[in-house]
Amino acid sequence: MVFGLSKSGIAAADALLDENAKVFLYDESENAFSSAKVDELIKRGAKPVLNRTLSEILPLYDVLVLSPGIPVNHELAVLTKKTGKRVIGEIELGYLLTKSPIVAVTGTNGKTTTVSIIDKILETAEIKHELCGNVGIPFTSKIKRLSSYDVLCVAEISSFQLETVNLFCPHISCILNITPDHLERHYTMQNYVYLKSRITFNQRESEFAVLNADDKNILSFSDKIRAKKIWFSSEKRVDGAYLKNGKIYYFDDMITEERKIALIGKHNLENVLAAICCAKILGADNSAIEEVLCSYKGERHRIEFVGHISGRDFYDDSKATNTYSAISAIRTIKKPTILILGGKEKGEEYGELFEEIKKSSVKYVVLTGDSMEHMQKSAIGCGFYDVYPEKDFYKAIALAEYLSDDGDAILLSPACSSFDCFKNYSERGEAFIKAVKDYNGGGKNEENR
């Protein structure tokens, strides 16, 4: 039975029907059954499960496939395990149905950027592959194209997806970084680190683990990894990819110069180094790697330059849904900055964020969303008093514009999820961009201070 009729759940059910499995569909929202895609699954033979108690549902199936949005401690998942039945996720199902070698990239931040770089390098190098996973393309939607050993699978993997892996074994695992995130679901940092490490659990000596040598949380479990370790570092020479005197090397082979890389920020340099490791393991040549690194400018809503309007630079970093990601953006923008923070909280504390803000180029912080009061207390507790609360998102943007001077940057980097006001970070980013495009000046000036 597939539990959760999101994009991943629908793809999982579709793949199971292709395998002639008997498929039941379950979702706690009856509205989920009203979509055309679910109708199509039902026409193909899937059975909707409606208006039944959990005790009535349990006997229907042998394996429960959880969509990523359903936590493993959900009552139905717990009851399923107690009866001795298997609980797996969509990623695990995809692994069981495919023959392709898998490159699996996880980490708190930078996953989408890194898999996108790998994707573009492999495309340039003419290496057959498919991109899927947490990038919005379910793994199981690619099964038909991943039916042979000569087509690689490049997958972004989240901590939610790693909750439900058991046999999953990628040819290359890549862990970019581990900093506090999703603690409202994973409860403790120890558990979150453990979940990230699970991506390596089934790997053997014949497989590869690409690891950040500068991340203490990754180093805490790296000795237990059986796969061949390939390291990356922006700070020191390692057996893998590293930066030295403005040049990027893979072992002793010079790949390109740092100044040629189109992406900005130290965090993106780390993503680039990780992608180089994966690409070199897969046989990509240096010319293909350099071509992509010199042209690829990044993903939408990740320190995205929106425009220079009325003397101000506007940046959309809506994808910064945790404090570490916001800190990366703050470190990247060097000019005087008005920072817009806030959204739905994820169980983080903000002391480290405001300590970083105190020593940065941030002049003022505009707080918005559900996290506003918590963030304001954290700011004051750290001795940063230039905070301006405004619950309404659009009024917060207007306030940031008002507080700005010619030559300033206005940066949306929320450090929180978007679910208090928006469907996702992308919708929040687009709302910011529209508000910026409508801006016609009106910041404070010498006369109205």
Language-model segments: residues:
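Beta-strand->loop->alpha-helix junctions that form or flank phosphate-binding loops
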Residues: D27, N51-R52, I88-E92, R226-L243, ...
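C-terminal helical cap/extension that packs against the catalytic core
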Residues: V38-I42, G351-D408, K444-R449
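Nucleotide phosphate-binding/pyrophosphate-handling subdomain across enzymes
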Residues: G9-E19, K128, E258-V362
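ATP-dependent carboxylate-amine ligase catalytic core
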Residues: P48-L60, I91-L96, K120-Y194, F201, ...
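Flexible active-site lid/hinge loop adjacent to a nucleotide/diphosphate
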Residues: S147-F232, Y242-K244, T256-L263, S418-S426
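N-terminal leader/targeting and accessory segments in enzymes
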Residues: M1-G89, L93, E447
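Short internal beta-strands
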Residues: K22-S29, A209-A213, I340-L341, S361-D370
